[in-house]
């Protein structure tokens, strides 16, 4: 009898360990009580921040200026080192050694709001080649991968152009290709549509969609709630270095109180939908539309 009870307890412990392991590997990013303060500041940029991001999701990280979203991204990529707390990438704790940071940067690519900060090579082709060669690929493998990415992303027309001569939209496309050629698990984009016209915004959005089709987890920092509403699977709201809400996109987009705390407003498309339901023009039984195109289709 005692032996049977011991066996049952052992099995329960094993199952719990397996369940924990499965739940941990479900998350490509886990941040636990992360703190960061910039030198000379008394205010924490990150204040006991905790957050889990599941694999393959499109996640918008939002909040007012100084909320900590850009600092969090820099910590994820190893550019900044938290003063306390832990960050796990694909279940592995970030180690702030040369080898550990190299491993992190293989897994996580970051595209800054201003791509001029990360484009240094004389031509587009050389720029996209640089990262993969620097990571140790031989020239033949690198050339094949770069040609494939250039073709796939439609960059052939200006692959020999100097990067400094490109438009802002083209530079952002090259910066994305520069990371994508290395097959990251996570892509981080800081304000991907900032300062772009409609044409280049559309192209950048198409590139982001290709990332998610490849199973890459995509995180963006943005102030644009309309953009996030139409694009993201989930939204993370931040304020004063903390995560104040993390949920599926439509939950967040209808949570007026949480949005207000994050210095945001309910998307105008949802406000319009509410007015139309109040006037009985549309039914309130459906989930609100994410985009103006979706709203228009319901009216036709």
Protein language model features and the residues they cover:
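ABC ATPase NBD Q-loop/coupling interface
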Residues: 86-103
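A short, flexible loop at the N-terminus of ABC-type nucleotide-binding domains that lies
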Residues: 16-28, 35-48, 97-100
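Conserved ABC ATPase "signature" region
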Residues: 140-158
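Conserved ABC ATPase "signature" C-loop
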Residues: 240-241
């Amino acid at each position: 009898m005692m032996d049977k009870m011991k066996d049952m307890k052992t099995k329960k412990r094993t199952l719990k360990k397996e369940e924990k392991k499965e739940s941990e590997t479900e998350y490509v990013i886990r941040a636990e009580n992360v703190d960061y303060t910039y030198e000379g500041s008394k205010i924490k940029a990150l204040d006991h921040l905790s957050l889990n991001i599941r694999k393959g999701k499109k996640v918008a990280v939002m909040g007012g200026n100084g909320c900590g979203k850009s600092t969090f991204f820099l910590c994820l990529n190893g550019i900044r080192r938290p003063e306390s707390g832990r960050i796990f990438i694909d279940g592995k704790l970030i180690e702030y050694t040369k080898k550990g940071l190299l491993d992190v940067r293989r897994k996580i690519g970051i595209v800054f709001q201003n791509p001029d900060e990360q484009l240094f090579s004389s031509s587009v082709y050389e720029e996209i080649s640089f990262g993969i060669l620097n990571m140790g690929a031989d020239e033949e493998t690198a050339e094949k991968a770069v040609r494939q990415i250039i073709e796939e992303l439609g960059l052939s027309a200006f692959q020999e152009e100097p990067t400094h001569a490109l438009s802002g939209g083209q530079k952002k496309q090259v910066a994305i290709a520069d990371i994508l050629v290395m097959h990251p698990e996570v892509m981080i984009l800081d304000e991907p549509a900032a300062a772009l016209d409609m044409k280049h915004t559309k192209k950048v959005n198409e590139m982001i969609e290709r990332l998610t089709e490849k199973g890459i987890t995509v995180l963006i920092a943005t102030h644009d709630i309309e953009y996030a509403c139409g694009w993201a699977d989930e939204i993370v709201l931040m304020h004063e270095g903390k995560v104040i809400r993390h949920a599926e996109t439509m939950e967040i987009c209808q949570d007026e109180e949480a949005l207000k705390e994050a210095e945001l407003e309910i998307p105008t498309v949802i406000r319009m939908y509410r007015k139309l339901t109040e006037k009985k023009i549309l039914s309130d039984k459906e989930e609100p539309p994410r985009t103006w195109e979706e709203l228009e289709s319901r009216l036709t």
